[in-house]
Amino acid sequence: MKALKNAGQEEVPSAWKMDLVIYSDLFLVNNTFDELYTYAINLNPAVEMALWKGGKMTAQVILPVATNLSGEMKRIRPGIIALSQDVRFRHNIFGKMTVGNFTNNRYGAQLEIKYRTNNGRWELGGTAGSTGFSAITREDGWYIGRKQRINASLNASYYEPRLNLQFDLKAGRYIYGDYGVRGDCTRHFGEYAIGLYALCTDGEINGGFHFAIPLPGKKWSRKGFFRVKPADYFAWAYGMVADGEYIEKQLGKSYSTRPNENRSSNFYQPDYIRYFLIKELQKEKSK
C-alpha cells in the first residue's frame, strides 16, 4: 500500500536523466566431456536514458569477470546498444520499434505489436526482426556482418488470476531459419517469478526453467541528473539440451533488445496487482 500513498502526486519526469545500471550475467552450459561446465561470469553496466514519451536509449558494455572459455568471451565487448520507441494506440494496441546491437551477437531492427484485453488477462501479438551477425574478433575488431536473417513469431499469453499463473505460447521462425513452437508456464510470487518451458523446433525438443528475483536497491530514488544503481532483477534460464544437432544447427536461437527483459520486470497484470495490494492491506490490518 505504500506505493499508493503518492498516487495522486505527479512524478518527477525522468526524460534526459541518466541511469548507470549494473547488470550481472551468468553463462553456464554442460556440453563438453573434459569439463563439468563451461561458464562465464560478467558484469554488464548499461547507461539508460529516457529521451521522450516512449523513447529510450541504452548503451551497455560487457566486462568479463571469470570464464573457462576463450575468444570473444574473454574480451570486453559491446552489449545492448539500442534506441527504442514504445507507442500505445487506441483499443489497447501497443507497439515497439527497436534498432541497434542486441544479445546473442545480433544487430538490426525489431518490431513488436500486441493487443491486450480490457482486463489484461489475454494478450495476442506478433514480433518480426531483421538482424545480422555482430562480434568482437582479434582480426577485425568489431565485426559487423552484412547478411541479414529474418525472425518472426506469433505470440499469445493468458494470466490465470486464481493461481497467479502466466501461460505463454509462441510459434514462428527463429534466427537461423528453423521453425518451432515454445510454451512457458510462469508462477508469480510477489516480485519473484519462476517457470518452466518446452520448445520444439525442426523436430528437436528442448526444455528447462527460468526465474527472476528482485535485487536489493531496486527502489533507489533519483536526486539529480545521474544515478548509479544495481539492476532491479536478476534473471536466468537453463536449457536441458546442450549438444547434438540442437547446438550444431543453432536451433531455437533468439535475442533480447533490452537488458532488463525477464518475467517480472514490466509485469503489470491488473488482477495480480489487485491481489498483491489486497495482501499488503491485510498485513497492515493485522499489525
Name every feature range the model reports, one short phrase each.
Residues 31-40, 51-53, 64-77, 99-109, ...:
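Solvent-exposed loop/turn segments connecting transmembrane beta-strands
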Residues 1-83, 145, 279, 284-287:
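Outer-membrane beta-barrel initiation region
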Residues 1-8, 135, 144-145, 151, ...:
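Flexible, glycine-rich linker and terminal segments associated
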Residues 1-2, 19-26, 42-48, 56, ...:
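Outer-membrane beta-barrel proteins and related beta-barrel translocases across Gram-negative bacteria
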Residues 41-52, 76-89, 108-128, 150-160, ...:
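Feature captures outer-membrane beta-barrel proteins of Gram-negative bacteria and organelles
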Residues 10-19, 52-58, 88-94, 118-124, ...:
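Short loop/turn motifs that connect adjacent beta-strands in outer-membrane beta-barrel proteins
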